[in-house]
Structures are given as C-alpha cells and as structure tokens.
C-alpha cells in the first residue's frame, strides 16, 4: 500500500526487563554499539583487573535492542582484533539479520566487511527457516571447532529433516537478483520511515 508503516517500540521495556538480571555484575562488561574506544577500554579494564574475557557477542543488525542499527566495519574489526589478542571468542548473532539485512548470511559478506576475518562462531536461523521451523545453524571457525566438545547434542530442536529441507529450499532461492531486491526493498523501507 501507499500508507506508511506503523510500528511500535513496545518490546524495549521487556528487553530491558529481562536484561536486568545482568546489571551490576562484574563479570559482564557491556559496550555501546560501535563504540570502538569503549570496546578497547573494556578489554583494558578486564586486563587491568586480571579478568579473562571468555567471549564477545555482537549482533550485526540489531533486532530487539535497537532495531535496524548495524555494526560498523570498524567496530567489528576492532572486536576481531581484540578477541584474538586476548584469547577470547568472537560470537556473532545473525539469527535475525542473516539474509534479511544485506542479502547475505554472514557479517563478513556485508558491504564494507569484505576482507575482514571471520568470527569464531556465527549463528543463523530465522531467514533460513522462514521463521516457522525449529532450525538453528552454528558456523564455527577452525579454532572454535577444536574447542567444541564432540558428543551427542540432542534435544527437541535438533535434527529436524523438514526444517533442513526448508533451509535448503530458501538457500536455493537466493540469487543475485534476490539479494539486490532485499537491499533495494530495505532502502525503500528506510526512505518511507524517514518521511
């Protein structure tokens, strides 16, 4: 339609409510998105206190916390550099962003991220399963794969053949034309929101 999109920020209260359990903990350090100096300061603070940073988590295009805000190449590059230097893992949560933001699955395939090193782990789901089937995918770097304990990981959400068929069908539909369409529709949507 020609009508502008209506949207609500009703999820923000619930988002912050559930994060409240992490406030005040000294073993969780948060950094504002794309604040490279803040990220460097967080790693320096951890080192100063003798804390080992197990992992850094990033969402390439935010969903619930600040919908649509994207991680910059400079911030990602700093995170990759710092995690590697401090022996921490870099985990990218592409559950919502994969395919839907830039027409590609991985953050390292986003425009401006070409040539940057891959994260240690990256998760995908909703774009692969049409948001309908219980399917999540975990991509691992060689380093992370070597740390991952081998064994049987079974639960309700694993090894769903139909969900795998859905993911294969989705990936078979991803053509250069579809990727361009995703990017063009995204730009169009942003222009309409800005009016």
Task: Put a short name on every predicted segment.
Residues 176-195:
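Conserved PLP-dependent catalytic core of the aminotransferase class-I/II
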Residues 112-147, 159-164:
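Active-site PLP attachment segment
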Residues 82-86:
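Helix C-cap/helix->beta junction micro-motif
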Residues 1-54, 74, 187:
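PLP-dependent aspartate aminotransferase-fold enzymes
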Residues 4-15, 73-78, 105-119, 140-146:
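A glycine- and small-aliphatic-rich helix-loop capping segment at beta-alpha/alpha-beta transitions
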């Amino acid at each position: 339609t020609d009508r502008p999109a209506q949207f609500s920020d009703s999820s923000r209260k619930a988002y912050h409510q559930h994060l409240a359990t992490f406030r005040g903990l000294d073993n969780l350090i948060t950094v504002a998105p794309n604040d490279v100096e803040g990220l460097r300061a967080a790693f320096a603070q951890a080192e100063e206190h003798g804390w080992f940073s197990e992992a850094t988590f990033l969402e390439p295009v935010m969903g619930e916390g600040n919908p649509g805000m994207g991680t910059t190449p400079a911030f990602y590059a700093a995170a990759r550099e710092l995690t590697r230097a401090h022996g921490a893992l870099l985990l990218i949560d592409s559950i919502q962003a994969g395919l839907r933001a830039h027409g590609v699955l991985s953050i390292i395939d986003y425009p401006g991220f070409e040539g940057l090193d891959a994260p240690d782990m990256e998760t995908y789901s909703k774009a692969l399963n049409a948001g309908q089937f219980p399917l999540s995918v975990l991509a691992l770097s060689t380093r992370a794969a070597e740390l991952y304990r081998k064994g049987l990981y079974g639960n309700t959400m694993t090894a769903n053949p139909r969900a795998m068929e859905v993911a294969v069908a989705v990936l078979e539909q991803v053509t250069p034309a579809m990727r361009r369409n995703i990017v063009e529709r995204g730009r169009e949507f942003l222009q309409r929101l800005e009016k």
